[in-house]
Amino acid sequence: MDCTWRILLLVAAATGTHAEVQLVQSGAEVKKPGATVKISCKVSGYTFTDYYMHWVQQAPGKGLEWMGLVDPEDGETIYAEKFQGRVTITADTSTDTAYMELSSLRSEDTAVYYCAT
């Protein structure tokens, strides 16, 4: 029996109200500690490069925690100190998709992850 802790990463699908703005995220993931996960967020209904894309974590029973952002126009990123060195946020303007990669996963990374613009 595999007694290794597994990390459940849920990805919330978000929809906006401004002119049918939609942010569609990839599905739930189960990973082992130490692994890496990459979550996608495909947008429609607005010009992708006009707004920053943020990523937020919500652990069970906890509030929202901002992880970082990317400027899709130039790829510039800003990360929260807590996630610095473990998170990489990117944007692919050819597909209007943002990505959040979190490495060296820990049990406390079990959470719902949101993209937001």
UniProtKB/Swiss-Prot annotation:
Region (Complementarity-determining-1) location: 45-52
A Pfam family that the UniProt record links to this protein: V-set
Region Framework-3, annotated ranges: 78-115
GO biological process, one term: immunoglobulin mediated immune response
Chain spans, region Framework-1: 20-44
SUPFAM superfamilies: Immunoglobulin
Cystine pairs: 41-115
Region (Complementarity-determining-3): 116-117
A GO MF term: antigen binding
Alphabetical list of CDD domains matching this protein: IgV_H (cd04981)
Domain Ig-like: 20-117
InterPro entries: Ig-like_dom, Ig-like_dom_sf, Ig-like_fold, Ig_V-set, IgHV
Protein name: Immunoglobulin heavy variable 1-69-2
Source organism of this protein record: Homo sapiens
